[in-house]
């Protein structure tokens, strides 16, 4: 199984949402990282066959997805950022409806729904109306519908939005298990969602893929740019605005330990810190750190 994206561009009048993107996806979990507005959702909608590219091609095992048509859709599971449902639908109603749209026989659909509801911990609310569920529960319903047809290609746009930490861990484990011999693409700006389960990550910015590698390979790009230093509490506000602080920790002696990004050490007695994928993300998207100040 191979999904090849060749020089894909998507334009809306005077705006280019996706700009000449090329990447080849093979079985395993792939992370698609980027800030809001980077072009991730537009790219995923093209991969799902919802949008047509302005130029470029998407090939599934060497054949354009437009040519494959229904045969491609049968291989596909897709969870958009926002998914619609009829207000009167219960969880069971919705999954049965989606299974019918995907062409699953009733007996197979019933078996698959039972299995997936258990996997996403929704068995007890299967008769409850979706409109009355919490945001996290609705997201889990969406995840279940994306898995109904046991897809070979799974495209998930911000799948963990609204999930609590325990649900996110269970979801990551489910995806790792599911990704055997399947392509799973996860779009997110929550780096921890993909840091430990993605075989490779691609980073999008302003419609372009600006970096692509394994987690280890990407993290190497930020080596010697992550530092840790200790300051008195009364100096915190001054340094917080001068540095790109990733996080801080209050110490028992009244000082503060800062983890920060810089080309060279800025604080007295700073030492190099072990880089993480989140550090690379914040290095590439400094505007997100500025917004938090």
Question: Can you annotate each of these PLM segments?
Answer:
Residues 35-39:
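Walker A (P-loop) phosphate-binding loop of ABC-type ATPase nucleotide-binding domains
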Residues 56-67, 71-72:
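Conserved ABC transporter NBD signature motif
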Residues 96, 100, 107-125:
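Conserved ABC ATPase "signature" region
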Residues 154-158:
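Catalytic Walker B motif of ABC-type/P-loop ATPase nucleotide-binding domains
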Residues 170-258:
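ABC transporter nucleotide-binding domain
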């Amino acid at each position: 199984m191979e999904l090849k994206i060749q020089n894909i561009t998507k334009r809306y009048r005077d705006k280019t949402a996706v700009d000449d993107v090329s990447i080849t996806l093979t079985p395993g979990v792939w992370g698609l990282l980027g800030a809001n507005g980077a072009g991730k959702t537009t790219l995923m909608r093209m991969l799902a066959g919802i949008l047509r590219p302005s130029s470029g091609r998407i090939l599934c095992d060497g054949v354009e997805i437009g040519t494959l048509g229904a045969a491609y859709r049968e291989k596909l599971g897709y969870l958009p950022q926002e998914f619609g449902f009829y207000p009167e639908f219960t969880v069971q109603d919705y999954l049965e409806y989606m299974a019918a749209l995907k062409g699953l026989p009733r007996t197979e659909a019933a078996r698959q729904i039972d299995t997936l509801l258990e996997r996403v911990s929704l068995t007890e609310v299967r008769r409850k109306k979706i409109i009355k569920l919490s945001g996290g529960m609705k997201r889990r319903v969406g995840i279940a519908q994306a898995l109904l047809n046991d897809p070979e290609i799974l495209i998930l746009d911000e799948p963990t939005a609204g999930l609590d930490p325990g649900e996110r861990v269970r979801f990551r484990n489910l995806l790792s298990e599911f990704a055997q011999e399947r392509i799973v693409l996860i779009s997110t700006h929550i780096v921890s969602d993909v840091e430990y389960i993605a075989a490779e990550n691609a980073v999008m910015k302003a419609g372009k893929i600006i970096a692509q590698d394994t987690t280890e390979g990407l993290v190497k790009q930020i080596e010697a740019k992550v530092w840790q230093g200790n300051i008195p509490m009364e100096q915190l506000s001054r340094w917080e605005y001068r540095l790109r602080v990733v996080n801080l920790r209050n110490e028992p002696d009244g000082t503060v330990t800062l983890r920060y990004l810089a080309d060279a050490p800025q604080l007295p007695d700073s030492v190099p810190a072990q880089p993480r994928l989140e550090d690379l993300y914040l290095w590439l998207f400094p505007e997100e750190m500025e917004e938090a100040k």
